């Protein structure tokens, strides 16, 4: 009887409550983040202690809207969840990690509470390539009749034929035009000239290689023969203020350049009235206006391509920035300079014979920055791209990037090239290049070299030149109608 009483007096064992589970301290990105881009996302969770997520539990981690959980990993106090198969559709996705999935390492410890993490993807409309449908008029409402004639002709030829073109070797001669004729029996439809030697015009007697821009016999000859005239401007500026001070009296300073690594000239200062840099560019613009006026007086329209290649290399080749001083300090000053140049030449100096061509760089990846640098539809008539590549492909990537830039509102052209894009390939691809302009090369004696050894040019063999010039998809000077009326 006593033993029975003793057994009934025993106390039940004590059951301890589990210790609180791991607590979530932070989440990256934060819960509720919007504008997520890409097809994958890594969510990083930080807890207040070391945690684990056994393989058997990882299958319980889910995400909705068709996305998938690719991987879950726990290490020390951090858990990462890799989410895949996301779409930039504007939808909100929710990641769920049920209670019991993540736990600590202590005995008699509860698991972490359920975690719900939501994020919203950026809405990106599906890419639809733009079709070329250029506007029917020039940006200058007072454009000369001859300029209108040229533009209307380019519109008519778009998608039918590409005009042949070459850049002269000495900036103001027809030597390359004549060399192509001598070799193929046809003259290029478009001849390119350059205000490269502006600071040395008129030509000093002892500098035979410098051009006299008052002598417009070369463009007059080209226009009179039915060809078109293109001018660009490798805009030389003083290397330093000292060079400007030393040369300002005779305007023939020795220290000049257009490459960024050769001049400290600052476009931002040039846009400020009252600075010596502004004084310089305004004098240059005035001088160029005078030379263009000579052409307008002769009824010669000018396909005008200043500030070419916009930003140069768009920093895609490294930290050195743009090639040319007009792109060194970013998009905004460059756009301002373009608009200033347009305003001065058109509105101040009253030049109505210009067709404005804005040029981009061909570098892959630069397409995403074109719009940042574009001065606006109201300042540009035609879009160009300078292409130096080791093939004769149709250049579809570059073509579509230009067309997309203005949703097809502007004609597009290969404004410079080495190896000529094959006209047949271009037509087969539906690439409606308005013209191509082959850059000039010459030997040490100044003779034109049609097939340089450089890989970007050497496919322009003797036979290929003849093939291109005789192509049914190419228009040469001999094929041009009279546009001088």
Regions found by a protein language model. Name each.
Residues 39-72, 100-103:
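Short, surface-exposed alpha-helix to beta-strand junction/turn motifs within ectodomains of secreted
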Residues 163-168, 410-485:
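Substrate-binding cleft of secreted/luminal carbohydrate-active enzymes
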